[in-house]
Amino acid sequence: MNRRIARIGILFILFALVVSGCGESGATSGPEDGKLKISASLYPLAFFAEEIGGEHVTVTHLVPPGVDAHDFEPTPKDVVKMADSDVLLYNGIGLEGWVDQVKSSLEGNTLIVNASKGVPLIKTDPHEEHGHDEHEQDHAHEHGNQDPHVWLDPVHAKQQAANIKNALVKKDPKHRGDYERNYDQLAQRLDHLHQQFKETVNKAEGKSFVVSHAACGYLADRYGLNQISVSGLSPSEEPSPKKLREVVKTARKHRVKYILFETLVSSKVAKTVQKEVGARPLTIHPLEGLTQQEKSRGENYFTLMEKNADHLGKALETK
């Protein structure tokens, strides 16, 4: 952790130097070349910006394909991209530990947008035995006891999209009409996705599911489900032996048939739970980023969330 703090400190110094160099030229004063330059920390934010901005924006997703956003640290090239952006979109809730270090240097040059503004946050409680509150506080992550995975709830994703739309309108008011229309179309698709999840949950036999790490708190909260997580808010957290026994006991109690594993993270501990419970593996996509293969296949937020809905429906089946 100390090494990571030191690296972020060095990044902050580099950021200040880059921004001071760009500030005099006015490189980030607006869409002078006809398009807004947008940098986004997470894939969902980049996708929403592309859908809303359309032909008026150029969007850069900072996290490389196949990299877990929890572990991402900006490179010097990323620093230059952010300093040259008209808008920087970040999720907030502590997921991007580097943002606070660079915000002060960017202010005045770049419009900095917390895409989760207005979303009611879920706080975790290690003393709860069930639901999205089940995780160990001993292994605190940068986002503390608040779940940052708001984009997995289509309703909260709609709020994030609205925040992005408002930012684009503020930075580029002459294209307000296009941004509003594109947002309305995106909002309708998110409403449809919300209905799809509701129908999936209503048809399900059970209300509990086991997942390798606690990324589905907002999804569980939205649809009245019980998330049983093997590890905490960060996939790198290792549960204590006591927590592991509790997870196995709870999974058996709810007669789960499947355990949901994230696509970018392989958890040996979760696989141990799977064997103990006698469950089968299923994937759930956290959507923090896409792999190169997924990009090549034309996958996007909606195609992957629809697959998540299908797999969640299976995971809610009971023995």
Positions of the model-derived regions?
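Bacterial N-terminal signal peptides
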Residues: G9-S20
